[in-house]
C-alpha cells in the first residue's frame, strides 16, 4: 500500500508548431519567377498581375520583377511589375 498520495498530472505543457506564415518578400523587392511572396490562411492578400495563387492560398511570382502591394476597395493586392 502506498504511503503517500499520487501526484496530480499537469493539464498544461502542449503547444503547436508555428506554421511560418506571413509576407516573405516586401514591396519594392525584386523576385524571380516561382518565388513565394506571401504564405497565408485564406486570402488576406489577393493575387494581382503576374502573381499566382496556390491551393493553400500561397501567393507566388509568375514572372520576375518587383513586388508591389496595393489596396483597392478595401482589399490588399500583390502585383509583380
UniProtKB/Swiss-Prot annotation:
Positions of the UniProt region annotated as Disordered: 1-23
Superkingdom of this protein's organism: Bacteria
InterPro entries reported in the protein's UniProt record: Ribosomal_bL27 (IPR001684)
GO molecular function, one term: structural constituent of ribosome
Keyword ATP-binding set for record: no
UniProt entry keywords in alphabetical sequence: Ribonucleoprotein, Ribosomal protein
Compositional bias (Polar residues): 1-11
GO biological process: translation
GO cellular component: cytosolic large ribosomal subunit
Family: Belongs to the bacterial ribosomal protein bL27 family.
NCBIfam families for the chain: L27 (TIGR00062)
Identification of the protein by name: Large ribosomal subunit protein bL27
Source organism per UniProt: Borrelia garinii subsp. bavariensis (strain ATCC BAA-2496 / DSM 23469 / PBi)
Gene name, Swiss-Prot/TrEMBL: rpmA
Amino acid at each position: 500500500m502506498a504511503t503517500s498520495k499520487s501526484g496530480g498530472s499537469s493539464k498544461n505543457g502542449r503547444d503547436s508548431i508555428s506554421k511560418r506564415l506571413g509576407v516573405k518578400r516586401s514591396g519594392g523587392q525584386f523576385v524571380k519567377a516561382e518565388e513565394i511572396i506571401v504564405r497565408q490562411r485564406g486570402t488576406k492578400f489577393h493575387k494581382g498581375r503576374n502573381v499566382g495563387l496556390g491551393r493553400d492560398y500561397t501567393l507566388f511570382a509568375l514572372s520576375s520583377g518587383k513586388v508591389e502591394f496595393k489596396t483597392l476597395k478595401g482589399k490588399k493586392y500583390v502585383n509583380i511589375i
